[in-house]
Amino acid sequence: MSIPGFVQADFDVFTIDGLEPRMEKIKNQIRPKLEAFGTELAPTLSSLTGDEMFVHTAKHARRTVNPPNDTWAAFANSKRGYKKLPHFQVGLWESHLFVWFAIIYESPVKGAFAEELLKAPTAIRENIPDSFKWSVDHTKPDTVSESELSDDAFTKMVERLRDVKKAELLCGITLDRKDPLVQDGDKLLHTIEDTFKTLVPLYQLAQQSTVQM
């Protein structure tokens, strides 16, 4: 059975004014698609990582005034939550779709993971394609390409993850909203799966950091 991709109207949801009107569209229009991808991707990630992975679709429950500027499905090895754990994300901003491996500010393994990255940065980055992106804040759409990231900038980014309480680190791909791939659900699914395969070593390194704590 084919899986539906994302159309321009899905990205336009993030231009709707007001919390309730935007949330209604997210719930009824975007979330079912993310859940469909989640159903397909969770078993794949479980196989790739060796951990049973569970899907967590963003509920944006803490929001009372400002509408969300993005939404996502996250994958982690816990039914209870994902924010404190190394995890994967698939989601949308108004401008693009993203596929991430993520360590966000709530994770207690940030420091240990950063130390592991600093031990062998060249070996780690050799497995990251030049087209992949890095982000230091999951709440902002800004990214930097692997091809544009100097050794010094990478080191500073990782040291910041270790030293700054609110620091984060995400790695993966972004696809422009007008990229034909975004609308083709089946091809998009394969692209996400391939991206996750590339990112699994980062996940395993983070899990190794968890064990060492």
Swiss-Prot record:
It holds the Pfam family DUF1054. Belongs to the UPF0637 family. This is UPF0637 protein BH2637. It comes from Halalkalibacterium halodurans (strain ATCC BAA-125 / DSM 18197 / FERM 7344 / JCM 9153 / C-125) (Bacillus halodurans).
